């Protein structure tokens, strides 16, 4: 998989179509050979490969890639779920607010709890604040507009993360622009909702925030966020069960961009195979000791210590994020 179909075809003297057919057989073989362990906490996200959004499934607990599919259509998600024989093992599914994902989970994994990724929600608060900032530019001098644009990142950072200089600049802007101050405080208070570990406190904080927001001059800027939380309330607040997010999968897109740069001329299927079927990228672990099976074997005198202590048996958890990143940095994939 280190060469494109065209390069292989030229080197062995056959046409590109023949190489493509051989590759399909190879992929089918590897699909059977590498059966990744079903995640207890499944992440659904998307990555852009060859200019299109693709479905990526991750194991949140183990920080691995579980699978990558050519599109994120509801039918594709449903079909992939149906291929998981032990899908009842899945307890939580994290996602963004893409309804086809939710519909697919409710259809095939009705026992699993849907969790909307918190970072997709709080990002909307940042977008609302930035929209207020943009609306104020019309009343500023050209110098003020340039300065506010250059320092917009200060507005988007959490207040407790600002250094002394940034805090001074923020106070200056908010002191001169009351509308920006109000929008900024709403952004900070929305983030504050997710700082508590207590779900009841989280609900209370949101209720108070929503009331203040709808009574403010910034309500139009935040209306999309309010509507999203109203429509996905249960799934958003399921976050407090385990505080699960897809945060680490944000690195996927940068990873894939590196893969694409290294593999100009590759098809989606070839890039997918380079990632999923590269055994040196796989994270493995010894299975947990099955005490009930051990006790049963002892009871019926069928105990075999070699089978229980088989060092060759491992669980394949998928493509490890950290290993993938390290190999890409070395140009080794």
Predicted regions and their residues:
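Acidic/histidine-rich catalytic cores and adjacent linkers
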Residues: 51-53, 61, 86-111, 115, ...
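Short alpha-helical "recognition helix" segments of helix-turn-helix
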Residues: 7-12
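Non-catalytic alpha-helical coupling and interface elements of nucleotide-dependent molecular machines
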Residues: 1, 13, 24, 28, ...
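RNase H-like nuclease fold core
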Residues: 15-104, 111
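Short alpha-helix plus adjacent loop in nuclease-associated cores
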Residues: 121-142
